[in-house]
């Protein structure tokens, strides 16, 4: 996703000895352009990724998703699916922190044949969203770049936010620009060099 691409672009630039760089990365969802810019912090850069196009997502296997899931999603006001190379369910709530992700996340995801990332989202300020994430195959995660992007896109189409949206997640903040191209911008920090042994 977008967060992984930001980190990958940072790692490639660092390996090449470049503080600022631009690379194109081939992904299953298409070619993604990544631009890395320096910051005042030595090990942190700002990386921007072109995220592609948000399309309608998959349909659940039930007619009324919220009624079928029941109590774990009682706080959901409305929801919509989206796809940006991977499937997402965006759920509007008043307080994302009040949602029991360990219950609500898999309860919603289970109604999508190939699974889906599930996001509980609230407007937290002018052109700002707060998001908590249940990620398919991973569970509760602190951040999701593709999720931040689709949440901003869905809430923009609902008329709740503008074209540039700051998305707050437990793992940090990202800026989504819904222009052309649609971009995700956020920090990427070098933490460690790892040597992976051959199996």
Roles of regions detected by a PLM:
Residues 3-143, 150-199:
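Active-site proximal loop and beta-alpha junction motif in alpha/beta enzyme cores
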């Amino acid at each position: 996703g977008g967060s992984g691409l930001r980190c990958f672009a940072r790692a490639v630039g660092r390996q090449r000895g470049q503080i600022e760089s631009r690379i194109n990365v081939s992904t299953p969802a298409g070619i993604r352009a990544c631009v890395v810019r320096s910051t005042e912090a030595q090990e942190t850069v700002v990386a921007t990724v072109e995220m592609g196009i948000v399309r309608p997502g998959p349909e659940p296997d039930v007619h009324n998703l919220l009624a079928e899931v029941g109590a774990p999603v009682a706080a959901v006001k409305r929801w919509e699916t989206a796809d940006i190379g991977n499937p997402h369910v965006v759920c509007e709530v008043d307080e994302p922190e009040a949602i029991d992700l360990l219950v609500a996340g898999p309860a919603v995801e289970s109604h999508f044949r190939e699974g889906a990332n599930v996001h509980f989202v609230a407007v937290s300020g002018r052109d700002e969203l707060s998001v908590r994430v249940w990620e398919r195959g991973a569970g509760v995660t602190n951040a999701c770049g593709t999720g931040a992007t689709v949440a901003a896109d869905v809430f923009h189409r609902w008329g709740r936010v503008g074209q540039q949206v700051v998305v707050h997640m437990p793992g940090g903040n990202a800026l989504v620009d819904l222009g052309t191209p649609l971009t995700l911008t956020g920090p990427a920090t070098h933490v460690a060099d790892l040597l992976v042994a051959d199996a």
